[in-house]
């Protein structure tokens, strides 16, 4: 390598253009600066440890999460941080320097039986849904339901939740409640928070009557439609079988 080639290599170490040079220097600056910032944390993103910056907002259950330069964050990812689960619900498409997303604190572990007859569970966000229309249909007429029996659910899109549809039932309540409330999905909006097949679904559910097919102990609706309910074992009578004859001496 000649002197001129060595010179060219040195001046192009940060890029061939002025823009590339500016970008490289900014990425180096952030990599050196972020670990010293109080917003710098180590979180578990989709079961993988990742160093990120987490910035507070006016809402305590909403944060901004920023990746290190050269790393990425996916819309719909589940983040474990500060002994809580958080769901990434929005992502800035401009990832030139870093990935910037909004994440919300999860408050419910949804449980259901998937089409392959396997019990699934996934963290989601449950909110009051009285401001939404339920999307119910009755006698081919659109029905607007009033009252306080609606909830909104935000959940990550994946191969299992993509199959959720109108009429799917779930038990959604405090996990320690003995008799959990049942809800049916009435507004399966699947395009409001997904981009390039990544992101979150935003559903509206209406309270319905619980049935004998619901397993309140496990928190799974329609559980006994798929799995047999355990039969109560009959205790033998002290007097013996009803067919047994007594003999008197």
Locations of the language-model features?
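N-terminal intrinsically disordered, low-complexity, charge/repeat-rich segments that act as generic
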Residues: 1-115
């Amino acid at each position: 390598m000649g002197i001129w080639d060595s010179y060219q290599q040195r001046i192009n170490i940060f890029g061939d253009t002025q823009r590339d040079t500016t970008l490289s220097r900014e990425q180096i600056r952030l990599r050196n600066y972020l670990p010293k910032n109080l917003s710098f944390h180590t979180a578990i993103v989709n079961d993988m440890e990742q160093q990120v910056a987490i910035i507070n907002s006016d809402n305590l259950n909403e944060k901004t999460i920023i990746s290190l330069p050269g790393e990425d964050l996916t819309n719909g990812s589940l983040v474990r941080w500060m002994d809580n689960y958080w769901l990434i619900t929005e992502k800035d498409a401009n990832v030139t320097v870093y990935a910037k997303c909004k994440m919300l604190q999860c408050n419910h572990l949804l449980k259901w039986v998937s089409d392959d007859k396997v019990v699934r569970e996934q963290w989601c966000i449950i909110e009051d849904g009285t401001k939404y229309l339920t999307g119910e249909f009755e006698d081919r007429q659109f029905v607007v339901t009033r009252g306080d029996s609606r909830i909104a659910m935000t959940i990550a899109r994946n191969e299992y939740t993509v199959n959720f549809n109108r009429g799917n039932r779930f038990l959604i309540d405090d996990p320690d409640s003995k008799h959990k409330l049942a809800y049916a999905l009435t507004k399966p909006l699947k395009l409001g928070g997904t981009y390039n097949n990544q992101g979150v679904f935003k559903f509206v559910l209406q309270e319905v009557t619980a049935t004998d097919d619901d397993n309140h102990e496990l928190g799974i609706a329609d559980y006994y439609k798929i799995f047999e309910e355990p039969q109560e074992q009959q205790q033998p009578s002290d007097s013996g079988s009803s067919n047994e004859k007594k003999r008197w001496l």
